[in-house]
Amino acid sequence: MSYAVGDVIAPFTINAVSEDAMKDWAVFLADPNPIHLDVEVVKAKGLGDRVINQGPINVAYMMNMLMAAFPDGTIEAMDSRFLDNVYGGDKAVASGKITAVDGNRVECEFSLDIEGRGTVNAGTATIRLNA
Amino acid sequence: MSDEAEFPPAPQVAGTSLDGTRIFTVSAEENARLCRSVGVAPAADGTAHPVWYYVATQVAMGKTVAGVCETCEFDVEDGPMMGSSGVRFSGPIMVGQPYKVGGEILSLVRKKSRKLGVMDVLTYRLRLHPADGGDAILETDNVWVLPRKELA
């Protein structure tokens, strides 16, 4: 495959962020923070009226987009900033574009956007293309 | 007078070791479950989903999240917030491969923001090594925001 600066990366979409996935991640992360599990706690803390997705799940969505876009490559580096919460039931879309191509390395910028609320994560990545 | 002079300095925690003793292994079952939870199928080549970088380093570092907060004299119940996460891979995370974690706190900087008031910005670095030794297969820098309600 060939890549060029400005190429748009095919989006990766989660139609409804899963509350069951948050329960799984509480186990993976060994972190039973109730803001991911109990909507009443979220309400009590004034953080909204739905449970909040664990941050690294949002990173995984963006990684999924990159892995699908570069089946002949691997993620060498990735930086992402957490700008806002993602809630259970949100429709999340990871999208991005290529910003540089240098030999077997491709630089990308990307974001994770929530329908109706805008960007909640943004970042950059370097993909190493396999020989 | 600067804003910083209005409140006491952040605890001096830079250099605190986060080296872990726990061995962390991603099983095929766990990897499949994690992949399903984020909407993809597991890879067929034995590599784990790369987001395990975050999970493995957090779970197998030498302190719990609450423990890291305590080191920073911050109550985890006050709600630490993820600011950013960066990772640099030199190799993939493999299913069934045992790993261990090394790392340290890089900095804790007290700031004042219009949105959050007084907060401490915590940066720590973790590395994932094969459990039997050798170079790290990844290094991650995580930044957490610790809102200091008591200083607001």
Regions found by a protein language model. Give the residues of each.
Chain A
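HotDog/MaoC-like acyl-thioester-processing domains
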Residues: 1-13, 85-131
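Catalytic strand-loop segment that frames the active site of acyl-thioester-processing enzymes
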Residues: 1-51
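A broad, structure-centric signal for solvent-exposed, well-ordered loop/edge residues
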Residues: 16, 21-24, 42-44, 59, ...
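Hydrophobic beta-strand-centered segment that forms part of the acyl-chain substrate-binding groove
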Residues: 44-98
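Glycine-rich loops and low-complexity Gly/Arg-rich segments
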Residues: 35-40, 76-77, 105-106, 118-120
